[in-house]
A protein has these predicted regions:
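Domain-level signal for soluble alpha/beta catalytic cores
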Residues: 1-367
Length: 367
C-alpha cells in the first residue's frame, strides 16, 4: 500500500529549525550589515542543505523549511493586496508564552498579485531533484479569525459577504499562481479549526459576539470556493494546527465539534491532523472522513520535544485510527512543523532529523 504521489505515507508539515547561518544573516540584514541579495544567498544555501537532509531521511517530499520566513503566516499576508501588518497591544497567548505583538488588518480590496513567495517556490522546485516540492501557505480563515470584523475596514467591506467572496477569490488566485509556477503539492496551514475544537476558545468566540458553528460553516464555504477549478494533478492538504510556538500550544479538545463540517464537507485532498497527545482527543471523529476520497495524515510524532516515540506505540495508534478510517487512507507525519516561527521549538537539529527518520521508518514498516 505504498503511495507514489502526495500525500505520502511518510510526510512532513513544513517548517524546520533555522540554522545559525540563517539566524545570523537575518540579524545582519536587520541591522543593515548585508543587503537583501546577500541574505537570499545565505537562505539559498541553507535551503539546499535542508532539502538534502530531508531526502537523506527517506522522504519523497521536501519543503524549504520556511527558512525565508519569520512567521508561518504573517510573511504570506504581507504579500497580499489590501492587507497590512500592524503592532498590536499584545501578542498571541500560548500556554505560558506570548508571541511578539503583531496583527494584520484589511485596509483595501483583497487580491493576489506577483507575490514574492512564488519565486521562493520556484527556487525550491529547481533544487528538489526527484523529490516532490511542497509549498505551505496559511489558510484563508486565518486572515479573518484573529481580528474578525474589527480588523476589516468597514468602508472597504461594509458587507462581510463581499469580504468572504474576495477572500475565497484571493486564495483561488493564489492556488492558480502557485500551480502555474510548477507547484503540484500545496498545504494550507489552519489554526482556526483547532480553535473551534476548544471549549475555552469557543467561549471567547461567543463573548465577542460570534457563533463558532456558523464560523465553521463559513470557513468551509470559503475553502470550497477557493478550491473551485483546482487542477486534477494538484494535491491540496489542510493542516489543522493547535498552535506551535517555542514548543507551546493554544488549543485543546478533540475534533468532534468540527468533524462533520470539516471532514464531511471541505474538499481538500488530505487532512494533516495533530494527534501527538491527549489534548487531541480520540480517533472517533475520523468516522466523518469520506471513504476513498481523502487521505488523513496523522501527526503522531511530536515536534515539541526531542524524546523519540516508541515505534510500536505509534504503530498501535495507527491501527486504532484504522477502526474509523480505512488504513489505505492513512499516512504519517510529525504533528506540526519544527519551527512555525523563526524562534523554533525546544529540541536540537539532530533530534529533529531523528524524528523525521522515525516517521519514514515506521511508514516503511506499516505500508
Amino acid at each position: 500500500m505504498q503511495r507514489h504521489h502526495a500525500p505520502y505515507r511518510a510526510d512532513v508539515v513544513g517548517s524546520f529549525l533555522r540554522p545559525d547561518s540563517v539566524k545570523q544573516a537575518r540579524l545582519q540584514f536587520a541591522s543593515g550589515e548585508i543587503d537583501a541579495g546577500q541574505l537570499r544567498a545565505v537562505e539559498d544555501e541553507a535551503i539546499r542543505h535542508v532539502v538534502e537532509q530531508q531526502c537523506a531521511c527517506g522522504l519523497h517530499v521536501v519543503t524549504d523549511g520556511e527558512f525565508r520566513r519569520a512567521w508561518w503566516h504573517f510573511d504570506f499576508f504581507d504579500g497580499l493586496q489590501g492587507v497590512e501588518r500592524y503592532d498590536s497591544q499584545q501578542g498571541i497567548h500560548f500556554n505560558g508564552v506570548q508571541t511578539k505583538a503583531h496583527g494584520v488588518r484589511v485596509t483595501g480590496k483583497l487580491g493576489f498579485g506577483d507575490h514574492p513567495m512564488l519565486e521562493d517556490f520556484r527556487y525550491l522546485k529547481s533544487i528538489s531533484g526527484n523529490a516532490q516540492p511542497k509549498m505551505t501557505i496559511p489558510s484563508p480563515s486565518v486572515l479573518h479569525f484573529r481580528g474578525g470584523r474589527k480588523d476589516i475596514d468597514a468602508t472597504v467591506y461594509p458587507d462581510l459577504k463581499d469580504y468572504f467572496d474576495d477572500l475565497a477569490t484571493t486564495w483561488r488566485d493564489a492556488i492558480r499562481a502557485f500551480y502555474d509556477a510548477g507547484c503540484r503539492y500545496l498545504q494550507l496551514d489552519d489554526t482556526v479549526w483547532a480553535y473551534l475544537c476548544s471549549e475555552d476558545q469557543r467561549r471567547q468566540i461567543r463573548e465577542r459576539g460570534d457563533d463558532a458553528d456558523e464560523l465553521a460553516r463559513t470557513y468551509a464555504r470559503v475553502l470550497n470556493k477557493a478550491l473551485e477549478g483546482k487542477p486534477d494533478d494538484l494535491t491540496i492538504g489542510l493542516h489543522v494546527c493547535r498552535g506551535n510556538f517555542r514548543s507551546t500550544w493554544i488549543s485543546e479538545g478533540g475534533y468532534e465539534p468540527v468533524a462533520e463540517v470539516l471532514f464531511g464537507t471541505v474538499n481538500v485532498d488530505a487532512f494533516f491532523l495533530e494527534y501527538d497527545n491527549d489534548r487531541s482527543g480520540d480517533f472517533a471523529p475520523l468516522r466523518f472522513v469520506r471513504p476513498g476520497k481523502q487521505q488523513v495524515v496523522l501527526g503522531l510524532i511530536t515536534t515539541k520535544h526531542g524524546e523519540l516515540e516508541n515505534p510500536e506505540g505509534v504503530k498501535a495508534r495507527l491501527e486504532e485510527a484504522a477502526r474509523y478510517v480505512a488504513k489505505e487512507q492513512i499516512c504519517l507525519s510529525p504533528q506540526c512543523g519544527f519551527a512555525s516561527t523563526e524562534e523554533g521549538n525546544s529540541l536540537s537539529e539532530a533530534q529533529q532529523w531523528d524524528k523525521v527518520r522515525l516517521v519514514t521508518q515506521i511508514a516503511s514498516d506499516v505500508w
